[in-house]
Amino acid sequence: MRGRTRESLVREARVLARTEGFKGYIHDVGGPTANFRAPACALQEKGGACADRECLHPEPCPRLRVDHREYLDTLRAIRSVPGIKKVFIRSGIRFDYLMLDETGGRDFMDELCEFHVSGQLKVAPEHVSDRVLEAMGKSGNAAYERFRGLFKETNGRLGLKQYLIPYFISSHPGSTLDDAIELALHLKRTGFVPDQAQDFYPTPGTLATAMYRTGLDPRDMKPIPVARGEREKRLQRALLQYDRPENRSLVLEALREAGRADLIGDGPGKLVSSGNAEGGRNFRVRQKKEPRPEGGSRPR
């Protein structure tokens, strides 16, 4: 995979603008790591990625270049091409990288929200449990919470009403029922439940699959919890969509097994109603057109 120069992208935008039938909208520039597109440091430019460390985990590498100016200038150049009406970033951004930019991060967020979000912005926190995020090799949840706050503040200041669409995954190696419950409580607190639940699926050649296969973290060879059986995977997946009537019995089972019966009942601090089998007050009929505060499509 190779990055493209600004000149190459602008040249293609000009070709698109002259293409018959083109409506003036470019729907994505940069892919899912759009703002983290340049080599991370001088060492990566010469010899590729480091074999013994990651750029952002467990702490940002001191050699890491954090700068959004080149990407921001590229977006400005593309949207200034005659015939281009809108340039969107729809695959998502690396929010943890953005939050490290103390000099230009706010300017980037301003232009991102004002010019490049069509109403919803996809991001991939993947989980909120720091234990699971550590297994994933990702920044802790505090980075995502700071990003959420900045996104909300920027929207308010610019008079916009945009939504975050976070991607979460269940049953990743390292995740227990306690971690899945922590994620469910986060979803309830933020008012967002995903319409689709993504379960971990092992794929060859990945660190996570090595964990899944061996039950060990290859980085330190310590045991790591793994949800292998279909039952536990179903329980964790149900907690991602805790408010669906069809998941009620699984959510109750998960809470009781984890010793969290305190979350069963009615009220703001509860996860699932103790009402009848039809679902109680925690379960509502789906209404697809009314957005949730954080961008879901099912109101609470």
Locations of regions flagged by a protein language model:
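Catalytic cores of alpha/beta
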Residues: 104, 172-189
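Conserved SAM/AdoMet-binding glycine-rich loop
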Residues: 14-165, 169-173
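A generic structural motif
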Residues: 165, 194-202, 266-268
